[in-house]
């Protein structure tokens, strides 16, 4: 009896999912670089603060965007942010955003989120994820015809630690590789403190 097909099935279903660092590069809905340990999209999104630092889409006269977690529920994997936006004119405005799981994996862990503001829906899927950064694919619109897509690099407070220099370069390289920006837009996360 030829056991080769059974070995192949075992390799694909058991060995490869347990060794993500050994798998070849490719896009999966949720990935991690594994160096700081696995985090879920909800864990990253519910960090105290997250900051947009790069996008492949321009957001007009915006200097920085900071989202502060205002509420979270680990059981339902929902959360709310107060999103602070600073304009080039140094004027601030804030808005509230609530996120609900859009998809979950077999373990019930949210792998993507959705947020609704009026009649506009924004969906967030995670192309690459680690404890201090996430590369997020964002789809926003009120209908399929109105859909705008972007790819963004978000970081949390861990990104600003002094021992994070090499990690900063790596996450920016990953942004360029995964988002393939024709025109890369950078945002000032270092001076993005909420207004007084």
Can you describe what each PLM-predicted range is?
Residues 2-196:
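A beta-rich soluble binding module of mature secreted/lumenal proteins
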């Amino acid at each position: 009896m030829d056991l080769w097909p059974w070995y192949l099935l075992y390799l694909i279903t058991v060995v490869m999912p347990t060794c993500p660092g050994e798998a070849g590069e490719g896009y999966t809905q949720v990935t991690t670089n594994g160096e700081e340990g696995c985090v879920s999209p909800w864990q990253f999104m519910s960090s105290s603060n997250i900051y947009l630092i790069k996008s492949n889409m321009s957001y007009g006269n915006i200097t920085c965007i900071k989202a502060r977690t205002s509420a979270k529920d680990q059981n339902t994997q929902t959360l709310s942010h107060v999103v602070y936006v600073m304009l080039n004119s140094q004027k601030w405005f804030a808005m509230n955003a609530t996120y609900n799981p859009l998809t979950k994996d077999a373990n019930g862990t949210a792998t993507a989120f959705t947020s609704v503001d009026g009649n506009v829906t924004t969906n967030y899927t995670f192309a690459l994820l680690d404890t201090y950064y996430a590369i997020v694919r964002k789809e926003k619109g009120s209908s399929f015809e109105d859909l705008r897509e972007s790819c963004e690099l978000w970081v949390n407070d861990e990104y600003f630690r002094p021992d994070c220099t090499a990690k900063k370069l790596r996450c920016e390289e990953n942004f360029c590789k995964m988002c393939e920006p024709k025109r890369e837009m950078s945002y000032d996360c270092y001076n993005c403190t909420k207004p007084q």
